[in-house]
């Protein structure tokens, strides 16, 4: 043990000397050597059950212990320098603070070697950086939210250098590094205060690597401190938490342990979170208290479920088999689909940063641990087996990828055939036959097929087509041979039994269009009323029917007998007018028209286009105002940090489609304002 302590002190002196150099390059080289020096000294793999340096129960931490944390844990008093993170871990491992200095040195080495992993390669990197932002303040502030990554990296470098000396203060990244050093889980317990930033600190932290054979043990460490202004919590130290049933102090006789158990029960009764204890201290109502308590418990459960799902997703990716969305939803139904694709996109970005030629996801090719590689030189004995393993995984993935490509080609060909035959069906029916195709892919293929001209290949070669375009005569553009070839182009035969549901859907849409057309002909409804009554009918049908209705010529009125007799009266000046005007080429043969009669046709008045255009402009302006109100509503709610869900947004603006809502939401999150007024 003396040799171990001397080795720790010597390597600590080397690290302190290296901190005088600019940057972390010299310190990283020393850290690689320190890791090799400390490698022969093993660390405890199980928590200590007997506390040798017993100093009592921390009453302040016991009062701050939250209600959603694991029950039956007891905060122990630790004395030392700094905020006692490594002292608390040493108390849990060996029952005293004798191991704290070595844990501090090992954590510094871990942070130096795996710096890029902790800053941007870990799944919880964003959460850890948010916790580091808020570690200096007790509430969420705009300055901390806008703190750039370069400033955080500078703070990280300064923290690493400061950790090489006694009495330094640990941050959240020290907790992550300590979990990787001990290869165990650390449950970070944060009091029920500062609720906006509490989720970043109150969480289960997993190590970077751990043994696959056994489940890693879990150490419980709590943030303790003082309460300021009644409800603002200022953390300044860490406290070790140990199970009361496993606690042994000195010799395990019953006389010494009975008072401890009794005092623990009394303190648990006094410090339970109840409305009667808090109503005099804080100005809150009973409903608010129970709502906060319920939300904390629900958030804790959701956080645990989310972390388990994320850890399972990463583990399956490292093993080279990325589970599809359907299987993932069966295992974790509470995780939404958007979260699944967000995690998948993170892994895709990691693969593209590591040097991949494409952005496609190839599980098993590279993992986080391989990407954020250590500056150490890799050992040569395992290179052959590792290469064989990669070759096997590559062959397996190539087979799966070819199978997926074949399936996608089949789905695309099927959709194109249906659109050519004018029997396209919605996405929900398409998904039953091809469940692996996403909605966006379906609509992209559908748009391509709608723009595709199926008779282009039968109309001749490209040279003939170019010559036809150059010719000026319309007869040359439409030759009989080309017309016959277009007319005799093959058509896709459709089975009646297979497409019975499609025909029923087509007839339903047709009847709906006929009903909408009858409504427009009977009553001149506005565009907004039309969309409210028939939301599934396209807007182009509305304007087509309106224009055809207004342009419809009026039928000539049936003349009565008296009007007919009056109209048959021929004036003698008629023929003279015709002669003087020279209307016809046969002016000399006017006498042959003597026996003809002249009918006076009613005057034809063209429809009033000004009224039509005015109504069209009014409808367009109303639609623009409607969209402007929707954009303004979303932008205001986004600035108030109370962004509505699509269900709530649809209740206010029922005509806005879902895709438009998510397009505006994405623009706001990217910093693009919707309304510049």
UniProtKB/Swiss-Prot annotation:
InterPro entries: Vertnin-like (IPR038822), VRTN_OTU_dom (IPR047273). Functions as a transcriptional repressor that modulates bmp2b expression during dorsoventral patterning. Residues 356-376, 458-490 are annotated as: Disordered. Keywords: Developmental protein, DNA-binding, Nucleus, Transcription, Transcription regulation. GO terms for biological process: negative regulation of transcription by RNA polymerase II; regulation of transcription by RNA polymerase II. This is Vertnin. It is found in: Nucleus. Residues 458-472 have a biased composition (Basic and acidic residues). The gene is vrtn. GO terms for cellular component: chromatin; nucleus. Belongs to the vertnin family. Its main location: nucleus. One of its GO terms (molecular function) is DNA-binding transcription repressor activity, RNA polymerase II-specific.
């Amino acid at each position: 043990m003396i040799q171990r302590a001397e080795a720790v002190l010597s390597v600590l002196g080397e690290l302190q000397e290296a901190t005088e150099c600019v940057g972390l390059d010299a310190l990283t080289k020393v850290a690689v050597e320190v890791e090799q020096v400390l490698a022969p000294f093993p660390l405890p793999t199980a928590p200590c059950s007997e506390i040798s340096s017993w100093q009592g129960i921390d009453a302040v931490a016991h009062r701050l212990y939250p209600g959603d944390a694991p029950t039956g844990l007891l905060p122990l008093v630790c004395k030392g320098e700094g905020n006692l993170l490594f002292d608390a871990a040493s108390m849990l491992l060996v029952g005293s603070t004798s191991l704290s200095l070595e844990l501090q040195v090992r954590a510094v080495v871990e942070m130096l070697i795996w710096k890029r992993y902790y800053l941007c390669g870990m799944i919880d990197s964003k959460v850890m950086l948010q916790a580091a932002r808020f570690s200096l303040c007790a509430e969420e502030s705009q300055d901390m939210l806008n703190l750039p990554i370069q400033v955080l990296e500078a703070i990280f470098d300064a923290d690493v250098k400061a950790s090489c000396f006694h009495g330094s203060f640990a941050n959240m990244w020290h907790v992550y590094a300590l979990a990787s050093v001990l290869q165990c889980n650390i449950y970070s317990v944060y009091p029920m205060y500062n609720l906006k930033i509490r989720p970043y600190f109150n969480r289960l932290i997993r190590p970077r690597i751990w043994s696959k054979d056994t489940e890693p043990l879990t150490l419980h460490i709590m943030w303790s401190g003082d309460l300021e202004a009644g409800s603002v919590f200022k953390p300044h130290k860490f406290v070790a938490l140990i199970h009361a049933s496993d606690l042994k102090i000195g010799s395990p006789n019953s006389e010494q342990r009975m008072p401890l158990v009794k005092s623990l029960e009394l303190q648990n009764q006094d410090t339970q979170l109840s409305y009667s204890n808090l109503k005099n201290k804080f100005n809150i109502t009973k409903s608010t208290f129970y709502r906060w308590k319920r939300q904390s418990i629900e958030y804790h459960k959701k956080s645990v479920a989310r972390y388990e799902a994320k850890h399972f997703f990463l583990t399956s990716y490292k093993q080279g088999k990325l589970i599809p969305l359907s299987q993932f939803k069966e295992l974790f139904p509470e995780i939404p689909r958007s979260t699944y694709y967000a995690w998948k996109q993170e892994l895709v970005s990691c693969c593209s940063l590591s040097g991949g030629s494409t952005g496609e996801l190839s599980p098993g090719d590279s993992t986080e641990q391989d990407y954020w590689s250590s500056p150490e030189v890799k050992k040569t004995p395992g290179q052959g087996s590792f290469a064989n393993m990669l070759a096997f995984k590559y062959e397996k993935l190539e087979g799966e990828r070819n199978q997926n490509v074949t399936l996608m080609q089949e789905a695309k060909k099927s959709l194109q055939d249906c659109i050519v035959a004018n029997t396209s069906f919605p996405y929900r029916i398409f998904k039953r036959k091809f469940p692996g195709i996403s909605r966006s892919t379906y609509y992209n293929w559908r748009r391509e097929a709608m723009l595709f001209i199926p008779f282009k290949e039968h109309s001749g070669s490209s040279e003939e087509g170019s010559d036809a375009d150059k010719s000026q005569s319309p007869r040359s553009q439409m030759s009989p041979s080309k017309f016959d070839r277009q007319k005799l182009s093959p058509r896709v035969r459709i089975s009646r039994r297979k497409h019975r549901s499609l025909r029923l859907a087509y007839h339903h849409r047709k009847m709906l269009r006929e009903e909408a057309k009858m409504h427009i002909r009977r009553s001149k409804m506005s565009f907004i009323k039309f969309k409210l009554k028939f939301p599934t009918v396209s807007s182009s049908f509305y304007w087509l029917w309106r224009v055809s209705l207004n342009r419809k010529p009026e039928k000539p009125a049936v003349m009565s007998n008296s009007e007919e007799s009056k109209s048959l009266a021929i004036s003698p000046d008629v023929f003279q007018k015709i002669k003087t005007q020279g209307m016809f080429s046969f002016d000399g043969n006017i006498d042959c028209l003597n026996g003809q009669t002249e009918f006076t046709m009613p005057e034809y008045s063209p429809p009033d286009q000004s009224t039509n255009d005015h109504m069209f402009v009014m409808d367009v302006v109303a639609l623009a105002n409607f969209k402007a109100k929707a954009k303004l509503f979303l932008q205001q709610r986004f600035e108030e940090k109370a962004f509505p869900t699509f269900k709530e947004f649809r209740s206010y603006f029922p005509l806005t489609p879902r895709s438009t809502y998510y397009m505006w939401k994405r623009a706001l999150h990217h910093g693009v304002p919707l309304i510049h007024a």
